Amino acid sequence: MEKLNIAGGDPLNGTVHISGAKNSAVALIPATILADSTVTLEGLPHISDILTLRDLLREIGGNVHFEKGEMVVDPAPMISMPLPNGKVKQLRASYYLMGAMLGRFKKAVIGLPGGCHLGPRPIDQHIKGFEALGAEVTNEQGAIYLRAEELKGARIYLDVVSVGATINIMLAAVLAKGRTVIENAAKEPEIIDVATLLTSMGAKIKGAGTDVIRIEGVESLHGCRHSIIPDRIEAGTFMIAAASMGQEVLIDNVIPTHLESLIAKLREMGVRIEESSEQILMVGGQKELKPVDLKTLVYPGFPTDLQQPMTSLLTKANGTSVVTDTIYSARFKHIDELRRMGASMKVEGRSAIITGPAPLQGAKVKASDLRAGACLVVAGLMAEGVTEITGLEHLDRGYSQLEEKLTKLGATVWREKLTDQEIEQLQNS
C-alpha cells in the first residue's frame, strides 16, 4: 500500500495533456465483444479499470493486446462464461459486460458490480431495459443471470436519466431484431462516443446525445478503429487545480464544449479562462476569488464528478458558497477530511456549505472514493506543509499518470510505501 505526499504552495505552470475518457473507455472495451472481427481502440488512459477490463475480456477467451494507450481486441474466440465476483467487484462499470454479452451470446452471468461507494446506485433501469428487450433477469447468490431466447426491439422509457442504463441498453439492442427506442436517455458525451464506435462497427443508431435514441437492429457487427474522446473530468480537475494555484496552465487535448458548466462557474468566481478548439488556457494571479453556489445536474449541467474537487477550491473564495449534489447524496465524505485540513464547512442534507477564505494546512487524509481523492489532491496543492493521502486505489482507477502530470506543472508530489505501523493504523481507522 502507498500514500501520495504533496508539499503544498508551489505555483503551477506549463502544459498538461489530458488522457482518454475513463467513463467512455469502460463502455467502449465491453462493446468490442459485439464485433465478429478485430477492434482497435486508440487513446485509452492507463488506469487500473482498463487493465481489469482487459483481463476480463481475456478470461472469456478474447485475444487482447494493450500498450501505449492502444488496445487491439479480437473478439472472435470469445465464449459466454460466468464472470466471477473477484475482478468484477473492483469495477463499477463491469455492468456493461451484461449488455454486451447479452447482445452477442443471449446470456450472461456477472457478479454484482463494485467501484466507488456512493450510496444507492441501483441497476434497476438497466434490468428494466433488458427485460423489455426480452431477457429474463434473476439475481442468484450475488450474481446477475441474464437469459434470452431472442432479443426484440422495444420502446423503453428510463424513469431516471442514467448514463449506465442508456449505454447498456444500446449495447444489448444493436443486434436485437427490429427497432429499439430509448426515451429519457442520458445525453453525456461518453454516450455519443460509444454510439460512434458502434456505428463504425455497422450498427444503426440515431439520436445519441439527445434524450431519444433510436436503434435499428442489424444481423452482425464488424471490427473497426476508433479514437476515444478526451476525459472531461480529468480536464476539469486540472482546471480546478490551475484555478487554485496556477500562474498560466494550458490544458491540452480537451473539448471545451464538454465543460461549459465548469467554465461558467470558474469565470463567475473571477478566474480568467481562454478557449480554443482543443485547448483551454487558465490564467492565474487573481487577488481574490468570489464565492458561488452550484448544483450538480445531469449533462450538460455541472458534473457530480467535479463537485468534490470544486469544494476544495471554494475554501479560497471570499464568502459563503453552497454546493448541492442532486445526483449522489452520499458524495460528501470528503468534507470531514477537508475540515481536518482547516476548511470551514458543514453538510446539511444534500448540500455542503463552505465559508472562506480558510487557509488549508497539510494533514493525513484518506480518499473514500475516486473524486474525493481528486479533491484532496487539489487541497494538498493549496495547503501549507505536507499532505499525505491514502486510499490511492481509488485515485488509480481514474487518473492516468497523476504524479507525472502534476510534477511537470511544478508541483512537489511523490509516492511512498506505507510502513506496517501506518497500514495497521489505517485498518483500525
From Swiss-Prot:
So, what pathway does this thing act in? Cell wall biogenesis; peptidoglycan biosynthesis
- The active site is formed by 116
According to the lineage, what is the superkingdom? Bacteria
Concerning InterPro entries, the annotation shows: Enolpyruvate_Tfrase_dom, Enolpyruvate_Tfrase_sf, MurA_subfamily, RNA3'P_cycl/enolpyr_Trfase_a/b, UDP_GlcNAc_COvinyl_MurA
- Keywords in alphabetical order, please: Cell cycle, Cell division, Cell shape, Cell wall biogenesis/degradation, Cytoplasm, Peptidoglycan synthesis, Pyruvate, Transferase
Under catalytic activity, the entry for this protein gives:
phosphoenolpyruvate + UDP-N-acetyl-alpha-D-glucosamine = UDP-N-acetyl-3-O-(1-carboxyvinyl)-alpha-D-glucosamine + phosphate
Q: What class of enzyme is it?
A: transferase
Q: Cite the binding residues for phosphoenolpyruvate.
A: 22-23
Segments forming a coiled coil: none
Task: Write out the annotated subcellular location.
Answer: Cytoplasm
UniProt: UDP-N-acetyl-alpha-D-glucosamine binding residues: 92, 121-125, 305, 327
What's one GO-annotated cellular component?
A: cytoplasm
The modified positions for 2-(S-cysteinyl)pyruvic acid O-phosphothioketal read 116
- What terms describe the molecular function in GO for this protein? UDP-N-acetylglucosamine 1-carboxyvinyltransferase activity
Gene Ontology BP annotations = cell division; cell wall organization; peptidoglycan biosynthetic process; regulation of cell shape; UDP-N-acetylgalactosamine biosynthetic process
Q: What is its EC number?
A: 2.5.1.7
Which family would the database say this protein is a member of?
Belongs to the EPSP synthase family. MurA subfamily.
Q: What does this protein do?
A: Cell wall formation. Adds enolpyruvyl to UDP-N-acetylglucosamine.
Protein name per UniProt: UDP-N-acetylglucosamine 1-carboxyvinyltransferase 2
Q: What is the lineage of its organism?
A: Bacteria, Bacillati, Bacillota, Bacilli, Bacillales
